[in-house]
Design a protein with these regions (language model features):
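Juxtamembrane boundary at the C-terminal end of a transmembrane helix
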Residues: 2, 181-193
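Structural signature of hydrophobic alpha-helical transmembrane segments
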Residues: 3-18, 67-82, 133-146
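Juxtamembrane transmembrane-helix termini in multi-pass membrane transport proteins
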Residues: 6-43
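Generic transmembrane alpha-helix signature in multi-pass membrane proteins
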Residues: 21-29, 88-93, 104-106, 113-126
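C-terminal ends of transmembrane helices
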Residues: 22-36, 84-98, 150-161
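Small-residue-rich segments of transmembrane alpha-helices in multi-pass membrane proteins
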Residues: 43-53, 103-118, 168-180
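Ordered, amphipathic secondary-structure segments that act as subunit-interaction surfaces
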Residues: 60-103
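Interfacial loop-to-transmembrane junctions
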Residues: 155-173
Length: 193
């Protein structure tokens, strides 16, 4: 039951983008096409899951036992950067079109505050290894879900007549706000778990 609660809260109630406002740059930058959003969601899911596992093990196995918690942020950033490089190499070989579409946003996963934020939150919440992995995967799914829904709406907005003053970023921000309000409808459900 604890894990179900973590999943529901991470995906819907405390969605990392729509409630905690982490990862806004890729959320706005890669959300013009659904295909790109799916690719970015998959890349973030992979990096976030592996980064959380590695950073958790480093924190509990090296940093805490040796009193090196002050190296937490730099260690986590190095782990994330290494994983992003690995994803970039794999995507370049496996799916060159997706690699081209993601463009500059793929290396930006390194500085995506979602990845670092989740790695730090897992430590702050004092989750176990299993709970931290459930939280990481759920957070990544929540990010991908919000990104895919938002990109679907933006594709539809591209086909409609939007007043000139509202085209581009203004209508995207208004849409993101409405989407965030829709996700607020899930607040309170976390009390069940």
């Amino acid at each position: 039951m604890e894990y179900i609660g973590i999943i529901i809260v991470a995906i819907f109630v405390n969605n990392v983008v729509l409630a905690q406002f982490l990862g806004i740059c890729p959320f706005l930058g890669v959300s013009k096409k659904v295909d790109t959003a799916i690719g970015m969601g998959a890349a973030v899911t992979f990096v976030l899951t592996i980064a959380t596992l590695v950073t958790f093990l480093l924190q509990k196995g090296i940093l805490e036992p040796f009193g090196l918690q002050y190296l937490q942020t730099i260690t986590f950033i190095l782990v994330i950067a290494s994983l992003v490089q690995m994803v970039e190499i794999v995507l370049k070989k496996v799916s060159p079109p997706l690699y081209q579409v993601l463009g500059v946003f793929l290396p930006l996963i390194t500085t995506n505050c979602v990845i670092l934020g989740v790695a730090i939150l897992v430590i702050q919440k004092d989750y176990t290894l299993v709970s931290s992995m459930v939280y990481a995967v759920s957070t990544a799914v929540g990010f991908a879900l919000a990104l895919i829904i938002f990109s679907t709406i933006r594709e539809q907005l591209a086909l409609t007549r939007v007043p000139k003053a509202m085209q581009g970023v203004p209508i995207a921000l208004i849409t993101a706000g409405i989407l965030a309000m829709a996700f607020m409808g899930f607040s309170g459900i976390d009390q069940v778990f």
